[in-house]
């Protein structure tokens, strides 16, 4: 019985000792580690100057935080001995960003932007710790202001030259991200390149002047046309030849004329060429001897190379000397 009673006695003290020793040790370690981690993160982010030469002040602040936490937990019993220390410790505790450390860990970039907006002394309990940070923030704001001024000047110059391509954009605010600014700068560069490229576009090449007067000289008959229908044929050929610059373009236009021109005109169905096909709006040339009108395609003549004097196949067979001389026959000859 004595042995049985003596066995539980050594088992009882370990469970009573464990809760007494372990909880305060765990609590102390977690708070210290958390404070060190927060101070490291804040110093790395630039909110707090790195504490290189004053390690004692950091340890004192940690002790003051522990006393404040104990004072809040215990109640009014510990208030009387810790009243002077609590008064002195509360301002630094308010200045320390312990409650904001979780937000800093999750979203450090957003806090950087907020600090740029607020500037030095923007927050109530956060201004003293951000005193070493105002210089880079001011430099960034100044650079942004300079960029916005340059953009406004560029837009004003572009407004004088070109109309606005779309609805007016809102002025850039401080809340815009750096990526948006880079995109806007790229757009500005592209617009400048388009403006410069648009000014250097070459003018469309016009047809050469010597080619234009050739068709009317050759197509128009020297004397009066034999009939009114032939005069109409000459006028139509003149307009078609003046508008065309090459044989391929002339053929396309002839096809268009065949489709578009009405067939009510008398000259449209007139047959004068030895191919026994009507005028049909195609360019023709008059023989210098007999005065008959023949299609250029039937005579194998290009519009760009129309001769001054043309002789049809019949005249060439009957009067070969006219071809050798290259001029009109004498008036006495038939």
UniProtKB/Swiss-Prot annotation:
Zinc finger (PHD-type): 270-318
Phosphoserine sites (modified residues): 57, 80, 83, 246-248, 331
Record-linked InterPro entries: Znf_FYVE_PHD, Znf_PHD, Znf_PHD-finger, Znf_RING/FYVE/PHD
Membrane-crossing segments per the record: none
Modification Phosphothreonine occurs at: 96
Domain of life: Eukaryota
Cellular compartments per GO CC: cytoplasm; nucleus
Segments of skewed composition (Acidic residues): 175-193
Compositionally biased intervals (Basic residues): 108-117, 143-155
Modified residues (N-acetylmethionine): 1
UniProt comment concerning the protein's domains: The PHD-type zinc-finger domain is required for interaction with LRSAM1 and negative regulation of autophagy.
Function noted in UniProt: Acts as a negative regulator of autophagy, through promoting ubiquitination and degradation of LRSAM1, an E3 ubiquitin ligase that promotes autophagy in response to starvation or infecting bacteria.
Family from the record: Belongs to the PHF23 family.
Protein's name in the database: PHD finger protein 23
Organism per entry: Rattus norvegicus
Lineage: Eukaryota, Metazoa, Chordata, Craniata, Vertebrata
């Amino acid at each position: 019985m004595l042995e049985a009673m003596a066995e539980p006695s050594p088992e009882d003290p370990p469970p009573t000792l464990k809760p007494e020793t372990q909880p305060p040790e765990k609590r102390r370690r977690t708070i210290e580690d958390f404070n060190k981690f927060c101070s490291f993160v804040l110093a790395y982010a630039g909110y707090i100057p790195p504490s290189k030469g004053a390690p004692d002040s950091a340890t004192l602040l940690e002790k003051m935080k522990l006393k404040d936490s104990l004072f809040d937990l215990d109640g009014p019993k510990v208030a009387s001995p810790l009243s002077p220390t609590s008064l002195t410790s509360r301002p630094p505790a308010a200045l320390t960003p312990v409650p904001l450390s979780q937000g800093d860990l999750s979203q450090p970039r957003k806090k950087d932007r907020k600090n740029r907006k607020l500037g030095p002394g923007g927050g109530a309990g956060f201004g003293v710790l951000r005193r070493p940070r105002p210089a880079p923030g001011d430099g960034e704001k100044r650079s942004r202001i300079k960029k916005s001024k340059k953009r406004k000047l560029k837009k004003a110059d572009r407004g004088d030259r070109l109309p606005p391509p779309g609805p007016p954009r809102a002025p850039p605010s401080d809340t815009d991200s750096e990526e948006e600014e880079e995109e806007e700068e790229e757009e500005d560069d592209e617009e400048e390149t388009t403006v410069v490229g648009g000014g250097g576009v070459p003018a469309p090449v016009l047809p050469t002047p010597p080619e234009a007067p050739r068709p009317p000289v050759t197509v128009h008959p020297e004397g009066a046309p034999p009939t009114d229908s032939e005069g109409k044929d000459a006028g139509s050929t003149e307009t078609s030849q003046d508008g065309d610059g090459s044989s391929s373009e002339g053929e396309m236009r002839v096809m268009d004329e065949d489709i578009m021109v009405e067939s009510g005109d008398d000259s449209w169905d007139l047959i004068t060429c030895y191919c026994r096909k009507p005028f049909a709006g195609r360019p023709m040339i008059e023989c210098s001897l007999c005065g008959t009108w023949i299609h250029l395609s039937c005579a194998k003549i290009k519009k760009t190379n129309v001769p001054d004097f043309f002789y049809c196949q019949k005249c060439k067979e009957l009067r070969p000397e006219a071809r050798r001389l290259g001029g009109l026959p004498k008036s006495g000859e038939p």
